[in-house]
Amino acid sequence: MSSNATSMVRSWDWRRILFTIFAGVVAFFLLTNLFRLAAPWASMTWYPHDDPRQLDPDLHRWHEAMWGAVTGILEGCALLALLWRPRENTLLIQFIALAALGAAILVLPFEPSLLFVIVMLALVVLAYPFPRALVDFSGEEPTMRSLLGLSVAAALLLMPYIVRLVFWQINRVGGEHAAANQWISDVEHSTFLLLGMFLASTKRPGWQILGTLSGITLSYLGVAALALPNYAGSWGRIGGVFALIGGLLFMAATRREARKSIHRPSKALPSAV
């Protein structure tokens, strides 16, 4: 290899290249779950069944809807936006990092097969080309009270639901729902949704994207709950109404504050060293 070619290879930003590869693969994997958004209304005759523990797929419509919303919309689209502008959306990589940690704590003890997904997410985080930004939680703007208030309200409403599902999973209540670890899966996805909402309220770089995705996810789950009020794990009609209204309010508040911030200078990010 000539000296010029060697110099060119050395000048490549290998960390950025690896990040693009890992993040692209994982984003594609997460986005393939978007088909699950059709679960509340889809015919089970053509709907894909990829878990042999689900003896009656019709029972799992709500779990599938929540899986598609949080994994496909919230996580998948967040990672896609991060691929587009990794330096300008540091809050999104922090969300991915915390989601990977949360999955390891919440779900891995029940579902060891999830280790592969957690490792892939960890590789995305480790390859992030601006590592100092990962541990920088400072912000140039104060926490957005409206988003924080909506996040707290959602957490208070979902906490009894989360505690109940954890109890059911540990005690193997609910037949194939427990056998397929669907209760703890719903806990994981509910927790990640709340995480996205709380992080969006910090107004760190990327908060507009995370706030919008969190609002869309919450609104969709409200519609899904209204369509599946009596299904196992569903938030029911009342919960669906609250989720739909809350999601719309979250998106509206995000959009309103984003308009106010559009002319404000962005905080310079730490160097990648």
Regions found by a protein language model. Name each.
Residues M1-H49:
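N-terminal signal-anchor module of multipass membrane proteins
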Residues S2-T6, R10-S11, R132-D136, A252-L269:
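Membrane-interface capping segments at transmembrane-helix boundaries
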Residues S11-V26, N89-I93, P131-P160, K203-T217:
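Cytoplasm-facing juxtamembrane segments at the starts of transmembrane helices
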Residues W12-R16, R61-T71, L98, Q182-L195:
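Hydrophobic alpha-helical transmembrane segments
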Residues I21-T32, A97-L106, F116-Y128, T143-W168, ...:
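Alpha-helical transmembrane segments of multi-pass integral membrane proteins
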Residues T32-G68, A103-F116, Y161-V187, V223-A243:
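Membrane interfacial helix motifs at helix-loop boundaries and amphipathic/re-entrant anchors
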Residues M66-L80, L115-R132, E188-F198, V241-R256:
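Hydrophobic cores of alpha-helical transmembrane segments in multi-pass inner/ER membrane proteins
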Residues E188-A272:
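C-terminal transmembrane-bundle signature of multipass membrane proteins
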